[in-house]
Amino acid sequence: MTKRPMLALIAHDSQKDALLHLAAQEEYQLRHEFLVATKKTGELLAAAGLHLAVGTVESGKCGGDLQIAAGIIEGKVDGVIFLHDVRRHHAHQVDIDALYRVAALYGVPIASSPDAARVMIRARRRKRELRRVEPTLQAFRENFNAKKLRALGAAQQEAGPN
C-alpha cells in the first residue's frame, strides 16, 4: 500500500478570508489532496460549500498546531499552508514555533502566503503527474533494454563462435 501524504491548512482569524479565496481558486487541485486543517479553518472550508474533503484537528489554541507537527513527525503530513498573522503575538506562539521547527527538521515545506501556497499546490500536482508517468518510463526502459539485448544476442550469433 502506498502512502498518500496530507496537506495541512492553517489560517489565523485575520487570514481566513485569504485561505478561503485560495481554496476556491485552487479547488480542483485541492480535490486530489488529503487535507487536514485546524478546527475553525476546517469548519470555514466546509461551510463555504467547496467540494473538498477536509479532516480536522483541534484549534490552534487547543493544540492543533502541535497535532499537525506530530503528523509531520509520523510522516503523514508532507506540506503545510499556514497563513499566519505575524502582526499579532499569539498565546500559543510556542506551538506555532514548534510547528515551524519540526517542519524545518523534517524537510517539510510551509507556505506562509497565498502566492507561496499556489506554488506549493501546483508543485504537488506536477509531482503527482510525474508519479503517473514514471511506470510508463520504466516500462519503456525495460522494453528498450530487452530489445538491445536481443539485438546483441543476434549479432553475436551471426558472428559465430570465436
Q: What is each of the regions a protein language model found here?
A:
Residues V36-T38, T56, F82, I110-P114:
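General beta-strand structural signal in soluble alpha/beta enzymes
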Residues D115-R150:
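Short, glycine-/small-residue-rich phosphate/pyrophosphate-handling segment
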Residues F34-L35, H51-C62, R131-P135:
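Short hydrophobic/aromatic-enriched beta-strand-loop microsegments
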Residues H32-L45:
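Short internal beta-strands
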Residues L7, Y28-L35, G107-V108:
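Short active-site oxyanion
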Residues D65-A103:
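Mid-chain, well-packed structural core segment of small domains
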Residues Y100-M120:
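Short, acidic/small-residue loops that bind anionic groups at enzyme active sites
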Residues D17-Y28:
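Histidine-anchored nucleotide/phosphate-binding helix
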